[in-house]
From Swiss-Prot:
Associates with the EF-Tu.GDP complex and induces the exchange of GDP to GTP. It remains bound to the aminoacyl-tRNA.EF-Tu.GTP complex up to the GTP hydrolysis stage on the ribosome. One of its GO terms (cellular component) is cytoplasm. It comes from the Bacteria. Belongs to the EF-Ts family. The keyword Ribonucleoprotein does not apply. The keyword Cytoplasm applies. This is Elongation factor Ts. The lineage of its organism: Bacteria, Pseudomonadati, Thermodesulfobacteriota, Desulfuromonadia, Geobacterales. InterPro entries: EF-Ts_dimer_sf, Transl_elong_EFTs/EF1B, Transl_elong_EFTs/EF1B_dimer, Transl_elong_Ts_CS, UBA-like_sf. Keywords: Cytoplasm, Elongation factor, Protein biosynthesis. It holds the Pfam family EF_TS. NCBIfam families: tsf.
C-alpha cells in the first residue's frame, strides 16, 4: 500500500524516530499506526521518544578544528545532568557530531528551522523543472515532495547521513546514544567556519579533507 507523508509525520511526532525509519515501519506494518509504534520500539528506534520531553539543560560545547586549520566547528549538545555531561560516551558523541558538521556542512540542526520562504523558493524551482516533463499536477506534487525531503536531508544536520556510518542518519545516531546513555540529549546549535569562506579563491574540497583526516 502507499504510505502518505501525513502518516509518516504523525508517526514521527509520536515516536521521535527518523523519517525513513517511520516510513519503513509503516510499510512493514501495512500502514497501521499502533503496530508501527511497536515495530519502532522493538527496533530500539522509539526509545528516545519517552525521554524527549525531559529538560536537557546541562551538556557541553564541543569543538573540532581540521588538521590544516581550514575548518572549525563549535557545537552545543545538551543533556539532563552534569554527570552525563562528563560521561565518556557523551563526550565522544559531541566530538563525533562536531566532526560530522565539519565534513558534511549542514546549514540547520532540524527542518523546523528552515524558513518558509527558503522552502517555497526550492519548491518553485522543483515545480518549474517538473512541469517541463509534462506530467500531471498530482504526480508533479509527489515529485516535489520527494525533492523537498532530499533538500532537507542535504542541509539539516539530523537528517543527513552520518559520515561515520552512512547506513544511518544523525537522528538515528542521536536516538541510539539517548537509548544507551539513558538521558534526553539534544543538539541545540552549531557554527561552522571555513577558511576564506565567501572569498574568491581556488576551489578546494575541504569536506573531503576532513573526512580523509578522520579516516572516514
Amino acid at each position: 500500500m502507499s504510505i502518505t507523508a501525513a502518516q509518516v509525520n504523525e508517526l514521527r511526532k509520536a515516536t521521535g524516530a527518523g523519517l525513513m525509519d517511520c516510513k519503513k515501519a509503516l510499510t512493514e506494518t501495512g500502514g497501521d499506526h499502533e503496530k508501527a509504534i511497536d515495530y519502532l520500539r522493538k527496533k530500539g528506534l522509539a526509545a528516545a521518544s519517552k525521554k524527549a520531553g525531559r529538560v536537557a539543560s546541562e551538556g557541553a560545547v564541543g569543538s573540532y578544528i581540521h588538521a590544516g586549520g581550514k575548518i572549525g566547528v563549535l557545537v552545543e549538545v545538551n543533556c539532563e545532568t552534569d554527570f552525563v555531561a562528563r560521561n565518556e560516551n557523551f563526550q565522544a558523541f559531541v566530538k563525533d557530531i562536531a566532526m560530522h558538521i565539519a565534513a558534511a556542512a549542514p546549514q540547520y540542526v532540524r527542518r523546523e528551522e528552515v524558513t518558509a520562504d527558503v522552502v517555497e523558493r526550492e519548491k518553485e524551482i522543483y515545480r518549474a523543472k517538473a512541469r517541463e516533463t509534462g506530467k500531471p499536477e498530482n504526480i508533479i506534487e509527489k515529485i516535489i515532495e520527494g525533492q523537498v525531503n532530499k533538500f532537507y536531508a542535504d542541509i539539516c544536520l539530523l537528517e543527513q547521513q552520518y559520515v561515520k556510518d552512512s547506513d544511518k542518519t544523525v537522528q538515528q545516531f542521536l536516538n541510539e546514544t539517548i537509548a544507551s546513555i539513558g538521558e534526553n540529549i539534544s543538539i541545540r546549535r552549531f557554527v561552522r567556519y571555513a577558511l576564506g569562506e565567501g572569498l574568491a579563491k581556488k576551489e578546494t574540497d575541504f569536506a573531503a579533507e576532513v573526512a580523509a583526516a578522520a579516516g572516514l
